[in-house]
Structures are given as structure tokens and as C-alpha cells.
Amino acid sequence: MTGREFEQYMCKLFDKNGFWALNIPRNESGAQPFDIVAIRGDEVYTIDCKVCSGAARFPLSRVEDNQLLAFEKVFWRTNAKIGFMVYWSGEIYFLRRADIVKAIENKQASIKLTYNDLFCTVVNEVF
């Protein structure tokens, strides 16, 4: 699955679960901090979608400075769930802002994808 396909999949998945979901268009530099905003009532997600292969880890080198800044601005102003949706080996993991920030502060190179972070398994019926 490509990154663009994963973004489209996540929008459809949110939509099927009663969310209004917007895949944010890329600007000329491609540097928007989030790929998707999804809202259902008071529940809000602001997420960036990443596709990983190889080991079950998310390399923190893939986190951009503008994303960290946006994470903090959204965190301090909303109750949104903020972070990365990571597609790996047919499963989707949600890495939360707090875990990402903590790992960066601890100078970790990556975050292990674990069962605790599992958001869902990819289901083809969404398409």
C-alpha cells in the first residue's frame, strides 16, 4: 500500500465509522503537518499517515519539525487525538503524540509497534 492509498483508506475507514474525515491536500512544498482530520461529535483525530516496512518499528527520523510544532499547538488548544497512523504488515497502529515526544526527548531512534498501539487490522471491504 502506498502512502496516498493509506491516507485514502483511513479516510474511508473513519467515514464508515461515522466520522467526517478530510484528507488535507498537499501544498506546493508538501509540508502540511497532518494528512487527515476526522471528527465525530466531540471526538477529533489529527493524524499523519505513514507506511512502514521491515522491522515492526517506526523510525523517528520520519517525524518532521513542523509536525512536532503542530502537535503541540493542537494539543494545547483542543482535546484531539494527535499522532501517526502507521501501516505495517496489514495492520494499523496509532502512535500518540505523547509517546512520540517522549521517545524523541529520550533520543530514541525508533518506536516499536506493539499490540498496545494496534488501531485495527486492514479490512479490504473498506474499499
Where are these regions (language model features)?
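Active-site metal-binding core of divalent-cation-utilizing nuclease and nuclease-like domains
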Residues: 20-42
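Charged phosphate-binding loop/patch that engages nucleotide di/tri-phosphates or the phosphate backbone
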Residues: 109-127
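Conserved catalytic cores of phosphodiester-cleaving nucleases, focusing on short active-site segments
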Residues: 36-38, 42-55
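N-terminal prepro-regions of secreted/extracellular proteins
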Residues: 102-104, 108-110
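Nucleic-acid nuclease catalytic cores
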Residues: 72-100
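Mg2+/Mn2+-dependent nuclease catalytic core
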Residues: 52-70
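Acidic-basic catalytic patches of nuclease active cores, encompassing PD-(D/E)XK
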Residues: 1-27
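Short connector loops at helix/strand junctions that flank enzyme active sites
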Residues: 31-33, 42-46, 66, 77-79
